């Protein structure tokens, strides 16, 4: 039994899009079969049915109405799937055999343009990556807006990950033979990105001609070959999915990575630049604070400004001067903002023009938007700063386009461009004539209805229309006896009425419907001509849209500065960051107004190169460090900053090692990740960089951690090629001694007030190191039970009293009772031969107990050493006894060795991954380092 012709056709089409869900058009439905149907039915909550396909088993099938497809497509694309749209390419009624079908478009996460599923203030980027030896190139495009950016650099995974983090593409196009390990790295870090592969030849084919045809500004001699390959590969993929050349992608913008402030992946996350750490949403981020834009275009542009702060003084100061001028001209600023509120998303409307998917209502939105441009140009002429003057000279008012749209299109046209009711009266004579004929015909219909009512005496008689029968006379059954015999021709019988026609009615119907059909065709033709004219002028509209988005960004920064009492920073060349009464821009917005404690900062590359900050957890060290970084970023964006005064030197890179970055799911321990991040910073930071390091060394033993932190400080301060501006927060109070030994180290701490055994964090950074960590007080604030807090204080007193010795002398808690106890001297336990393996020590528990395993030899030995070991045992029959320690002095080297041996014995090597095994070995090696 063979496949049916339709199913053979389906499988042939499916062969060309194996990685897609195929929407196969059958009549008024898109049908999915086999595995596609199973996936779609699950994701879209559709009923899974079956269809005879010529095989023994029915083909799994589900379907959706074609007119509702966009909603379902959006859900699938949002879930990361690719959709191939297979349409009927001929009229089924005119086809003698099976209807010809073909794929007209492939919709992927990176090429989706439906505005209802795109974030209006965020680009939907697709990226291509090309690797050649030790060089790599990357291109980023947003086909909904027409942006196309390319760059290249020496290949480092960190560089690529940084750019991915910056642009946040939904999809990455790679050469099909690229190493799977690299793909794994990308997916591990960015699990929501879709990966697509194309052949090597698609990056190379007809490269210069393709780029010249696509980009108006392309000069083959200006670009490295690897950049051209990356761009060509991305253009191929866009054409392959969209099935046509998109005219809104008409300019390639090359950028150098070193032209912008580098903020690596971890720092973007830790500083919460565009999204918060917990929910991964905009609220609580720097973008959330700064975004007061009034247009979608401005929102996207501001995000780009924040993702790519500047490193050249002139453009930074141009933005700052423009913001300052807006603040000095509140009236003009308000006029600008009011007109910006009326501007729609010109970039994405123009993108729909390029893809031939724009409708008349969207062109009316375009008309309204560009109608505001002459007013904006007039407002710009009232400013004097260089940036605004340049904008005023460059902005195109697009008056010819506005005039055409205003003259041609109805103010409230049909949503569909193939239903008529688009063209305004007076624009085209033929349209006016057909509309009159259509109108006259309908007037004739109305007069016919009135005449028939009068002549028959049937007041309920009506002349109606539907698409199946056309025009007809309808009379209810209650009035059929009033119908004159032979007056009408019966057309249709209903349960409660009869429908009739007359020759005159059918004749007029042909005239009316003929006029309507012709009118729809002519209106559509005129609409496409208008659309084509706009497409020819896309470049002009895009330039104007970019200027509008820049104006919107500047107005947003001015609004935020005014609302939050920001000041204009001074951009200096002294390699110095000097901030007076600085505030964290986000934290001050989420706590009650006026409660944020401001702090001063002075960091340079000489006497104040490394600011060593000590103090308890929860006191505000991390907030303070992030505050300095965010103020620096804001200044380099061109924003005013939250401070009383700010002198900011331009940084080339910002690095952070703040907070837990555990990546246990990827087989990486806390300490391993921490050391990798520190290593990355030390290798890539320069003397122009700003580095934030928080609790370096915390993930390992105390002495290992202290040693590493100490060494890192020395390396940063003593390496002449580094000496970067650094904020270093630590719990290791021993490091405060480095101020006297290393040039550039300065001690600071968070001020704490002690009142009647209570502490108050004053959140103020003061000169000098902290003398204690207040860990127990923090635990108390966190809500630990009082018995635990009180016992911790007792233990701390003993530890601090014995800290100069290699022993602990800790009295038992009075809350725990036992009849049995043992006194063990330090010297006895140091003599391994005295006790051998007869005494086994459990890990010290919360009850401070030890365990003794007794046998006859042990008793005899203990008896002979009564001067060394005084032991009172109440129940000699007991083999295992719990004893409370009255005065317990114990050699920790012995316990550690015993614990490590036990830990090694318990390792289940057969059920470990290689990475888990490596981490366990690394952990054990660290533990043995503490044993002499």
From Swiss-Prot:
Keywords: ATP-binding, DNA damage, DNA repair, DNA-binding, Nucleotide-binding. ATP binds at residues 615-622. InterPro entries: DNA_mismatch_repair_MutS, DNA_mismatch_repair_MutS-lik_N, DNA_mismatch_repair_MutS/MSH, DNA_mismatch_repair_MutS_C, DNA_mismatch_repair_MutS_clamp, DNA_mismatch_repair_MutS_core, DNA_mismatch_repair_MutS_N, DNA_mismatch_repair_MutS_sf. CDD domains: ABC_MutS1 (cd03284). One of its GO terms (biological process) is mismatch repair. GO terms for molecular function: ATP binding; ATP-dependent DNA damage sensor activity; damaged DNA binding; mismatched DNA binding. Pfam families: MutS_I (PF01624), MutS_II (PF05188), MutS_III (PF05192), MutS_IV (PF05190), MutS_V (PF00488). Gene3D superfamilies: 1.10.1420.10, DNA repair protein MutS, domain I, MutS, connector domain, P-loop containing nucleotide triphosphate hydrolases. One of its GO terms (cellular component) is cytosol. Belongs to the DNA mismatch repair MutS family. This protein is involved in the repair of mismatches in DNA. It is possible that it carries out the mismatch recognition step. This protein has a weak ATPase activity. PANTHER family: DNA MISMATCH REPAIR PROTEIN MSH1, MITOCHONDRIAL, DNA MISMATCH REPAIR PROTEIN MUTS FAMILY MEMBER. This is DNA mismatch repair protein MutS. It comes from Clostridium botulinum (strain Kyoto / Type A2).
């Amino acid at each position: 039994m063979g496949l049916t012709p339709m199913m053979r056709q389906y499988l042939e089409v499916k062969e060309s899009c194996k990685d897609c869900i195929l929407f196969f058009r059958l009549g008024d439905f898109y049908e999915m079969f086999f595995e596609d149907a199973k996936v779609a039915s699950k994701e879209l909550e559709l009923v899974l049915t079956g269809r005879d396909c010529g095989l023994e088993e029915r083909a799994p099938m589900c379907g959706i109405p074609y007119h509702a497809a966009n909603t379902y497509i959006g859900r699938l694309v949002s879930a990361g799937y690719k959709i191939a749209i297979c349409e009927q390419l001929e009229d089924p009624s005119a086809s003698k055999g099976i209807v010809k079908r073909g794929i007209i478009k492939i919709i992927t996460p990176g090429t989706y343009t439906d505005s209802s599923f795109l974030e209006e203030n965020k680009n939907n980027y697709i990226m291509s990556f090309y690797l050649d030896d030790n060089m790599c190139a990357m291109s980023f495009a947003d086909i909904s807006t027409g942006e196309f950016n390319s760059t290249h650099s020496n290949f480092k995974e960190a560089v690529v990950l940084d750019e991915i983090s910056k642009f946040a593409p939904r999809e990455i196009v790679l050469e099909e033979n690229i190493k799977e390990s690299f793909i794994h790295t990308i997916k591990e870090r960015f699990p929501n990105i879709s990966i697509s592969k194309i052949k090597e030849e698609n990056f190379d084919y007809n490269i210069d001609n393709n780029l010249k045809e696509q980009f108006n500004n392309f000069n083959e001699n200006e670009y490295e070959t690897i950049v051209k390959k990356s761009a060509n590969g991305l253009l191929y993929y866009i054409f392959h999915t969209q099935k046509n050349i998109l005219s809104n992608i008409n300019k390639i913008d090359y950028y150098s990575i070193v032209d912008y402030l580098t903020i690596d992946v971890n720092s973007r996350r830790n500083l919460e630049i565009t999204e918060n750490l917990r929910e991964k949403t905009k609220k609580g981020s720097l973008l959330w604070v700064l975004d007061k834009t009034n247009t979608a275009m401005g929102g996207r542009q501001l995000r780009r400004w924040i993702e790519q702060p500047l490193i050249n003084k002139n453009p930074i100061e141009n933005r700052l001067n423009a913001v300052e001028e807006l603040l000095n001209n509140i009236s003009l600023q308000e006029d600008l903002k009011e007109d910006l509120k009326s501007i729609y998303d010109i970039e994405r409307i123009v993108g729909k023009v390029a893809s031939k998917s724009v409708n008349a209502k969207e062109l009316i939105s375009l008309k309204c938007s560009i109608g505001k441009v002459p007013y904006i140009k007039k407002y710009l002429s009232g400013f004097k700063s260089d940036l605004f003057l340049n904008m005023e000279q460059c902005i195109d008012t697009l008056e010819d386009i506005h005039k055409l749209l205003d003259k041609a299109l109805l103010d409230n046209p049909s949503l569909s461009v193939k239903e008529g009711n688009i063209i305004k009266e007076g624009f085209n004579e033929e349209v006016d004539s057909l509309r009159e004929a259509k109108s006259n015909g309908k007037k004739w219909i109305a007069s016919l209805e009135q005449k028939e009512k009068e002549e028959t005496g049937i007041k309920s008689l009506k002349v109606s229309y539907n698409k199946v029968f056309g025009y007809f006379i309808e009379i209810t059954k209650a009035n059929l006896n009033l119908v004159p015999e032979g007056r009408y021709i019966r057309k249709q019988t209903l349960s409660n009425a009869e429908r009739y026609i007359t020759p005159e009615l059918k004749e007029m119907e042909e005239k009316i419907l003929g006029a309507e059909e012709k009118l729809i065709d002519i209106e559509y033709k005129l609409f496409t001509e208008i659309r084509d004219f706009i497409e020819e002028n896309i470049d002009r509209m895009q330039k104007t849209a970019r200027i509008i988005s820049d104006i919107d960004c500047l107005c947003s920064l001015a609004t935020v500065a005014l609302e939050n009492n920001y000041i204009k920073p001074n951009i200096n060349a002294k390699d110095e960051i000097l901030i007076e009464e600085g505030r964290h821009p986000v934290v001050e917005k989420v706590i009650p107004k006026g409660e944020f404690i401001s702090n001063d900062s002075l960091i340079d590359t000489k006497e104040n190169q490394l600011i060593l900050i000590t103090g308890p957890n929860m006191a505000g060290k991390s907030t303070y460090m992030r505050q300095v970084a965010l103020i620096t970023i804001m200044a380099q964006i061109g924003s005013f900053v939250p401070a009383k005064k700010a002198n900011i030197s331009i940084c080339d890179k910002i690095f952070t090692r703040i907070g837990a970055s555990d990546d246990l799911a990827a087989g990486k321990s806390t300490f391993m990740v921490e050391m990798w991040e520190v290593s990355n910073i030390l290798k890539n930071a320069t003397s122009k960089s700003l580095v934030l390091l928080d609790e370096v060394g915390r993930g390992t033993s105390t002495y290992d951690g202290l040693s590493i932190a100490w060494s890192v400080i020395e390396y940063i301060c003593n390496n002449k090629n580094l000496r970067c501006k650094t904020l270093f927060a630590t719990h290791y109070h021993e490091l405060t001694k480095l101020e006297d030994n290393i040039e550039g180290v300065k001690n600071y701490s968070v001020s704490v007030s002690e009142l009647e055994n209570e502490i108050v964090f004053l959140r103020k950074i003061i000169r000098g190191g902290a003398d204690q960590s207040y860990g127990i007080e923090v635990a108390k604030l966190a809500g630990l039970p009082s018995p635990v807090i009180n016992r911790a204080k007792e233990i701390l007193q003993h530890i601090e009293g014995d800290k100069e010795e290699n022993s602990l002398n800790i009295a038992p808690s009075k809350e725990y009772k036992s009849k049995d106890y043992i006194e063990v001297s330090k010297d006895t336990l140091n003599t391994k031969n005295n006790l051998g393996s007869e005494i086994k020590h459990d890990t010290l528990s919360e009850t401070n107990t030890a365990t003794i395993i007794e046998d006859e030899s042990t008793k005899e030995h203990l008896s002979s050493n009564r001067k060394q070991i005084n032991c009172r045992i109440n129940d000699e029959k007991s083999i295992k006894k719990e004893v409370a320690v009255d005065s317990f002095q114990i050699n920790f080297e012995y316990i550690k060795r015993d614990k490590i041996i036990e830990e090694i014995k318990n390792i289940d090597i057969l059920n470990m991954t290689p990475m888990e095994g490596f981490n366990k070995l690394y952990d054990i090696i660290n533990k043995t380092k503490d044993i002499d």
